[in-house]
Amino acid sequence: MISYPFFSLSPPGLVPPPMAVPPVEMYSGSFWNRMRKPLPLRTQVIRFTVVFVIVSFILAVALQITHERMPDPKVTKPLPDLGFELLTKVPGMYVLADCCIGFLNILSVFTAFKLYLLHRHCVGSGEPELPCNIPGVSRFFLSVWLCKENCRIELRNVHTIAWIRFITSYALLLLFRSVVIVMTSLPAPDDLCQDPPKIENPVKNVILTVLTAGGGSIHCGDLMYSGHTVILTLHLMFHWIYGAMVHWSFRPVVTVVAIFGYYCIVASRFHYTDDVLVAIYLTIATFIAVGHNADGAPWQLQLFIRWLPCCGANSREMTEDSQPVMVAFKSEELDEMNGVLEGRQKKHGGVGDGEALMFKCGAYV
């Protein structure tokens, strides 16, 4: 058992204060040490969103190339697929997959807003108010939701960090997909691409692909791996980690919706089963690799946005409001505090939401 001279309160447990080393010492020295200095979270949000838009255009061009390179359906038949043999073909089920994605998009926006309210409560800003108070509606949308059993993450800036993690994972997956679909052309299994239409205006088709997320454009042959599965799995991972902090029911609901979406994709012959399985694995692995960090995205990814001449500053302003203040306790004082909390829990059946939220924000005052 490692014994530290002092501790700080932190959601994962007792750890040495991360700000024990001054920022100047932490990032001074060699060129690479300076490059590892984290960018401001607001800068990361803006720049990674710009990068995502650029990647979307790259993918749109890749879809254009893939459409032209797709094997002739009259000559090359679809590949054998065990999923096609096990699941009965139901034409048009891909529409329900799009509905699942739309539902999860709305739920993710709602969850992100609830995370923002948790952040406001953590820093002491309180709940916002609507110009006109509507009974029930204001309480539902503007009240703070916190599932204490599933909350193991620092609440300050949690909404910003969650968005950075989501958008960087999505951009990485789409960029890799742009390479994969161009490299190997597979015969299309769905009915819509058995007689693929000719693209008359490539530029217009690329723009429509970006604006409608592929829904209003022409593209066939983009099989390995499934873009629909990527966004379904991203929403699944987002709610499995962050949605569970807001309400326990988000995990089972999103899991059922995502699995139904996978079924719709295979049953409609929109993608091969391998397209779905590979997309699930890559999305989960990427989301875990990006991780949740108080500094935002991993420093290796931040290197790609440092060169942008706009959209935010490259250095953090060390102000009193932005600098976390660590609350340190000696081990004897910490044991005494734990005893007091245990006594309250036995006497009153638990601690209040305010106290629980205070200890989730315990690293800040």
Curated annotation (Swiss-Prot):
Q: Where is the active site?
A: H228, H271, D275
Record EC number: 2.7.8.27
Topology versus the membrane = Multi-pass membrane protein
Whether Transferase counts among this entry's keywords is yes
Topological region Lumenal? 66-92, 187-229, 273-275
Q: Which UniProt keywords apply?
A: Golgi apparatus, Kinase, Lipid metabolism, Membrane, Sphingolipid metabolism, Transferase, Transmembrane, Transmembrane helix
Q: Name one GO biological process term.
A: ceramide biosynthetic process
Q: Which InterPro entries match?
A: Sphingomyelin_synth-like, Sphingomyelin_synth-like_dom
One term of GO molecular function: sphingomyelin synthase activity
* Pfam families from the UniProt entry: PAP2_C
Broadest EC class assigned to this enzyme: transferase
| Gene Ontology cellular-component annotations | endoplasmic reticulum membrane; Golgi apparatus; Golgi membrane; membrane; plasma membrane
Cytoplasmic face: residue ranges?
Answer: 1-44, 114-165, 251, 297-365
Transmembrane region positions?
A: 45-65, 93-113, 166-186, 230-250, 252-272, 276-296
UniProt catalytic activity:
an N-acylsphing-4-enine + a 1,2-diacyl-sn-glycero-3-phosphocholine = a sphingomyelin + a 1,2-diacyl-sn-glycerol
Where's it found, cell-wise?
Golgi apparatus membrane
Q: In which family does this protein belong, per the annotation?
A: Belongs to the sphingomyelin synthase family.
Free-text function comment from the UniProt entry: Bidirectional lipid cholinephosphotransferase capable of converting phosphatidylcholine (PC) and ceramide to sphingomyelin (SM) and diacylglycerol (DAG) and vice versa. Direction is dependent on the relative concentrations of DAG and ceramide as phosphocholine acceptors. Directly and specifically recognizes the choline head group on the substrate. Also requires two fatty chains on the choline-P donor molecule in order to be recognized efficiently as a substrate. Does not function strictly as a SM synthase.
Q: What is this protein called?
A: Phosphatidylcholine:ceramide cholinephosphotransferase 4
* Species this protein is from: Trypanosoma brucei brucei (strain 927/4 GUTat10.1)
